[in-house]
Amino acid sequence: MESDIDRLMTAFKNRQLGRRTFLGSLAALAVTGCSSDDSSDTSDGSTEATLPQTGPPIPVQTINHMTLSVSDPAASLAWYQGLFGMPIAARQAETVVLQVGDGPQFIALGGAASDNPRITHLCLALDNFDHERIVQILAENGVAATGQSGPMQSRVRMRGEDFGGAPTGTPELYFGDPDGVVLQLQDSSYCGGAGLLGEDCLAIPEPAPGEGLLAVSEFNHFTIFVSDQQRSMELYQRLFGLEVDTYQGALPVLRVGSGKQFLALAGVPGVSTGLIHHASLAVGDFDVDRIFSLLEGYGLTVLGEAPGANGPLQAYVSMRGPNRGGAPEGTPELYFTDPDGILIQLQDVRYCGGNGYFGEECGTVENPTGRNG
């Protein structure tokens, strides 16, 4: 097991820690009596006692964005703008940043054509973002600063002016969870633009060609497939302090911030690598028949109530019943696939993953709703 000092040395050599942070971290290790060998490791590989804390070490507040890798970037841009009317808030070279709602949330469409279309990563945002400090915290929790974003590894990308960043580089921090699912961490003001925090986007976003058919206000949640649910939950909760106030049967809802947003970590037997299964977006005036009609007119095949899609450009609804924490008559959950088969969910702005027809009835940490048995 790599020691605390070894992790700091790796981060410093990879230029993911500045000299001041590096020396301060060494001093903190010396004060707490941590040694440079494996005997200093705790049983769970963490060194949370190194820094006194009153809350989670990385207190994320909101979902910030997702990046899509697509087969035809120009076609996907036209398709998403036609459906949602999202303006362009920024450009990162060929990558296009589509503003979600009033921002700073966004969907990024990668500029290079891909033969593996997917949600490449999701981003969580926190106040007072400091990439050096977060790299250190991740290292203290077993995520090594290797300059890569594989399983339990972190890297910092300095996005320069050629990619729409600051002259000295806009730091963007990525890390892989135990299954290799990539998460990005940024400041709450991050909109995918220039500036040291990525907060400097177009003063007037480039409008979409048309108004779009559906108005999206924000991200609602992501569902992630993992090989070991308890292991993944332990890391996410230890790093971010995500509390469970609601269950969908056996599936816990990890609340992000104080609103409706959440992450759902679904344990899937036989999964060798993690997967961001789908993203959910919040819309006003949620009505299944109305949305089906709009999607059908946009060229999608409506499957009705179904267990899933079997190809691109399909839409269906799943009625989540009491056995999965839903309403007695079923909580409608509407999904569609984009031109590449990427799965997107649409829910009412009140949806919190809970009971009730709109999934709006959630519990508290002390008294969670929806749990089986």
Predicted features by range, described:
Residues M1-L17, A27-V31:
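N-terminal secretory signal peptides
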Residues D4-K13, E48-A74, I119-L122, S188-M233, ...:
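N-terminal beta-strand motif that seeds the catalytic metal site of vicinal oxygen chelate
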Residues N14-R20, D177, D338:
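Twin-arginine (Tat) signal peptide motif
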Residues S35-S43:
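Bacterial lipoprotein signal-peptidase II cleavage site
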Residues I58, L68-I107, T223-A266:
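Core segments of cupin and vicinal oxygen chelate
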Residues S71-A75, L122-D179, V226-Q230, A279-L343, ...:
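Vicinal oxygen chelate
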Residues L98, I107, L124, F175, ...:
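Fold-core signature of tandem repeat domains
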Residues G110, A166, Q186-C191, A266, ...:
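Short beta->alpha transition motifs characteristic of CBS
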